[in-house]
């Protein structure tokens, strides 16, 4: 039976005690990291979320406390009272290593069974075990640092936005289902049988309604939900830093947000982000990097060599160019020595992105080796090398296909080769870039209709509105993403604030006027009552914390995450429910 706290009060945390505290009488509380009995002395390392403090109990100090201390084991929850003294054998690996607590009293609040995982840094344990015993996993110092960092980051963001005149306003969790994009999580209504609420994928329409309501500057650290197949670093529930601003243009939104980014990275990591952050159009990003999320920490840019090879008698090149595609290449410096097996693996790699194949050209000391050498004249080969500015030791990798396939395959290959060659090892740079002028729409061949690239409420660029009905693919959006080291950190846009233009936008993506009013009538109605020009942005807060904490696993930055199957090993959710509960909801499971 554990002891009660009663009148005992904790006076300080473990991790902040130094030589300046020598002579202080203190009370600390926490968990036993380990215990060592050296005969006449018992040493206990006590841990709380701030760090570890060594406590020494001895017969000569207090016999009762000494005897009681010998009964504790790892992860017992205890309190200790005593005096801070200088440590005879300092431990320079911990901040409190110059001092220790001379233990005069001990209270055992609760005992612990042997933990199924070690409470230590850099734990190497199966993920499902960590998630099943998450409350133990969260005791580990590296995990606790992450959640203290997460708290501090949220505070920095709140403080900055408060300084800028923003109001933090909560929007509903139970909302209306609008089946566009990812699947909604649905919540059946007891009062309205056969009808459902939807959990929000974002606060998009509510924050726009707040602009119509005259609140000018809104923000929220919002929980969002998407019932989608989980890829790496996706969770069914996640957190956004969401904001919306009235009477602004795109540059004003971007300017405010890069100042927010600068503040966060300075206060959390002491990293100076130089402003203004580089701007790059979507077209430039795709042409040079094959991605709308380019990693600018290294070069290896994509080059269009279509003009150089248009006269080459090689059917793959000819077919690509005749069908409106292109021939493009990347140069991998110092990789000409790659063996045939490695090159064959690269061929298979690009095929996973839809490419029909990969042509390689290795500039070796003994000459040029090429996978299509029999189709190239010496002049053809030299023209390609000149266009790529290749030198001895370089490897040229070429894809010829439809532009979409070329960009996706070479963009992915560029990242793959950067990892394979190790050029990013030890690179701790933070390379930000704004991507702008996205396509407003893209064509979905499966559904035989256009769909919104971001969402249906994005304002087209002024000069492109005229093409919305006649040539939709030509229309660019007033949209902007902030990208960091090849990952989207956040994204936003200027919004449509005109009912007729919003109806026209719905029409462009195959939503009739009647359907639009049925799904979004409350919003379209609001646009009739003097909506201001407005725009906003949302950050993936979990992803932001991943960057700041230096982890590549989203589960590390969420206290109680789901696994890859959207299942919680800790609570075993989702679970079956009583038939009586289903009956109340008018639901029958067959």
From Swiss-Prot:
One of its GO terms (molecular function) is catalytic activity, acting on a protein. It holds the Pfam family GAD. Its EC number is 6.1.1.12. ATP binds at residues 226-228, 235, 488, 540-543. It comes from the Bacteria. It is found in: Cytoplasm. Residues 204-207 are annotated as: Aspartate. PROSITE patterns: AA_TRNA_LIGASE_II. GO terms for biological process: aspartyl-tRNA aminoacylation. One of its GO terms (cellular component) is cytoplasm. Belongs to the class-II aminoacyl-tRNA synthetase family. Type 1 subfamily. Homodimer. This is Aspartate--tRNA ligase. It comes from Clostridium kluyveri (strain ATCC 8527 / DSM 555 / NBRC 12016 / NCIMB 10680 / K1).
């Amino acid at each position: 039976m554990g002891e009660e706290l009663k009148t005992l009060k904790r006076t300080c945390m473990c991790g902040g005690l130094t030589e300046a505290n020598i002579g202080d009488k203190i009370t600390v509380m926490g968990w036993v990291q380990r215990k060592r009995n050296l005969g006449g002395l018992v040493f206990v390392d006590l841990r709380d979320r701030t760090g570890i403090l060594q406590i020494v109990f001895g017969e000569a100090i207090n016999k009762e406390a000494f005897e009681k201390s010998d009964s504790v084991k790892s992860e017992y929850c205890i309190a200790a009272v005593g005096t801070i003294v200088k440590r005879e054998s300092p431990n320079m690996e911990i901040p409190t290593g110059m001092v220790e607590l001379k233990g005069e009293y001990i209270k055992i609040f609760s005992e612990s069974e042997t933990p199924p995982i070690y409470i230590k840094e850099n734990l190497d344990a199966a993920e499902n075990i960590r998630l099943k015993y998450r409350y133990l996993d969260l005791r580990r110092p590296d995990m606790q640092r992450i959640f203290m960092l997460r708290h501090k980051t949220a505070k920095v963001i709140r403080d900055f936005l408060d300084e800028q005149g923003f109001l933090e306003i909560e929007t509903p969790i139970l909302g209306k289902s609008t089946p566009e994009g990812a699947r909604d999580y649905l919540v059946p209504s007891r009062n309205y049988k056969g009808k459902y609420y939807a959990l929000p994928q974002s606060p998009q329409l509510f924050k726009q309604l707040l602009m119509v309501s005259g609140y000018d500057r809104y923000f929220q650290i919002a929980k969002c939900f998407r019932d989608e197949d989980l890829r790496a670093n996706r969770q069914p529930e996640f957190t956004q830093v969401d904001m919306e601003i009235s009477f602004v243009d795109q540059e004003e939104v971007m300017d405010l947000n890069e100042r927010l980014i600068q503040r966060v990275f300075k206060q959390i990591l002491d990293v100076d982000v130089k402003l203004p952050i580089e701007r790059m159009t979507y077209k430039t990003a795709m042409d040079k990097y094959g991605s709308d999320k380019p990693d600018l920490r290294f070069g290896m840019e994509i080059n269009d060599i279509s003009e150089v090879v248009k006269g080459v008698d090689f059917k793959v090149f000819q077919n690509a160019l005749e069908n409106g595609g292109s021939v493009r290449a990347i140069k991998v410096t110092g990789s000409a020595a790659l063996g045939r097996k490695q090159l064959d693996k690269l061929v298979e790699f690009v095929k996973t992105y839809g490419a029909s194949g990969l042509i390689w050209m290795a500039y070796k000391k003994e000459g040029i080796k090429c996978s299509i050498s029999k189709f190239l004249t010496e002049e053809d080969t030299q023209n390609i090398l000149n266009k790529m500015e290749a030198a001895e030791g370089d490897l040229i990798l070429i894809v010829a296909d439809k532009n979409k396939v070329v960009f996706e395959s070479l963009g992915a290959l560029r990242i793959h080769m950067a990892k394979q060659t190790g050029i990013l090892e030890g690179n701790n740079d933070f390379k930000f870039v704004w991507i702008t002028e996205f396509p407003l729409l893209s064509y979905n061949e499966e559904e035989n209709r256009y769909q919104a690239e971001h969402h249906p409420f994005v304002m087209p660029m002024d000069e492109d509105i005229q093409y919305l009905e006649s040539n939709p693919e030509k229309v660019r959006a007033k949209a902007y993403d902030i990208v960091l080291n090849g990952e989207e950190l956040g994204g936003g846009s200027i919004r449509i604030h005109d009912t007729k233009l919003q109806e026209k936008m719905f029409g462009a993506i195959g939503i009739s006027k009647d359907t639009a009013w049925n799904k979004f009538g409350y919003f379209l109605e609001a646009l009739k009552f003097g909506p201001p020009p407005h725009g906003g942005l949302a950050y993936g807060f979990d992803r932001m914390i991943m960057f700041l904490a230096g982890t590549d696993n989203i589960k590390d930055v969420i206290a109680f995450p789901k696994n890859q199957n959207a299942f919680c090993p800790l609570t075993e959710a989702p679970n079956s429910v009583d038939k009586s509960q289903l009956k109340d909801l008018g639901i029958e499971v067959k």
